[in-house]
């Protein structure tokens, strides 16, 4: 499987909220971090922490979709420009209530080793 196939498999599972399939794309010691507006909003270390976060996150959205707009690959790393759209299933704050739409554009930096994602950093 190519690195881009791995990325697309992860995104397909993410969009389907299939956490078990998502996790097959990651190595055991993986690191995930989300950076929004220059601030870290989430970080996990290891597959167990990632699974817990992924399961909580999947329940928060009625629907969610990442679309890959462009991909650059080199040195065991992929940089993907992502268009993100989601509809909340739960209230997150007074401004972000169930039914609210989220539309973001961001970049995902994915490091791959041994055919698995070992680090995923999402920037928006």
For each feature predicted by the language model, list its residue ranges.
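Hydrophobic pocket/interface hotspot
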Residues: 10, 22-23, 30, 46, ...
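Proteins with a high burden of low-complexity, intrinsically disordered sequence enriched in S/T/G/P/A and R
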Residues: 11, 37-38, 76, 124
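A beta-strand edge to alpha-helix "cap/lid" segment located at domain peripheries
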Residues: 51, 55-124
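Short, aromatic-enriched amphipathic alpha-helices that serve as compact interaction elements
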Residues: 2-18, 25
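A solvent-exposed, acidic/Ser-Thr-rich amphipathic alpha-helical stretch
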Residues: 4, 21, 27-75
């Amino acid at each position: 499987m190519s690195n881009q196939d791995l990325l697309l498999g992860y995104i397909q599972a993410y969009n389907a909220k299939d956490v078990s399939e998502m996790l097959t794309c990651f190595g055991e010691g993986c690191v995930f971090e989300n950076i929004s507006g220059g601030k870290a909003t989430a970080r996990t270390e290891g597959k167990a922490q990632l699974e817990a976060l992924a399961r909580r996150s999947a329940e928060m959205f009625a629907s969610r979709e990442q679309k890959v707009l462009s991909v650059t690959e080199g040195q065991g790393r992929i940089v993907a420009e992502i268009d993100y759209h989601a509809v909340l299933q739960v209230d997150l704050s007074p401004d972000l209530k169930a039914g609210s739409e989220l539309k973001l554009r961001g970049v995902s930096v994915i490091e791959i080793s041994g055919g698995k994602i070992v680090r995923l950093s999402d920037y928006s």
